[in-house]
């Protein structure tokens, strides 16, 4: 379960940003998770709540959005976007030999601070 490690790293960054802004509390966090990152949203939510206990982010509202993966199709010679790691076929030519170009893992998109 790498969700715990991702949650810990995200919290470190969130706390740094909150302290730099002089915030007393983090009330909301918006995360974007790559489609092929193998991150389970429910596990990430559980782990994030766990690591936030006793911190500025305890009790904050967590919002998770999934990001499409950008892939290159050699057969079509074009970029395609895929939402699920379970469907790795080009929507134009049905090629299953796609090269993943961008799937940005986990990104902190926005923080809500008090």
Swiss-Prot record:
Residue sites binding Ni(2+) per the record: 2
GO biological processes: protein maturation; protein modification process
Disulphides: none
GO MF entries: nickel cation binding; zinc ion binding
Annotated keywords: Metal-binding, Nickel, Zinc
Keyword Amino-acid biosynthesis appears in the UniProt entry: no
Binding sites annotated in the UniProt record for Zn(2+): 73, 76, 90, 93
InterPro entries with a match to the protein in the record: Hydgase_Ni_incorp_HypA/HybF_CS, HypA/HybF
UniProt KW Transferase keyword: no
Family stated for the protein in its record: Belongs to the HypA/HybF family.
Function: Involved in the maturation of [NiFe] hydrogenases. Required for nickel insertion into the metal center of the hydrogenase.
Protein's name in the database: Hydrogenase maturation factor HypA
Organism: Klebsiella pneumoniae subsp. pneumoniae (strain ATCC 700721 / MGH 78578)
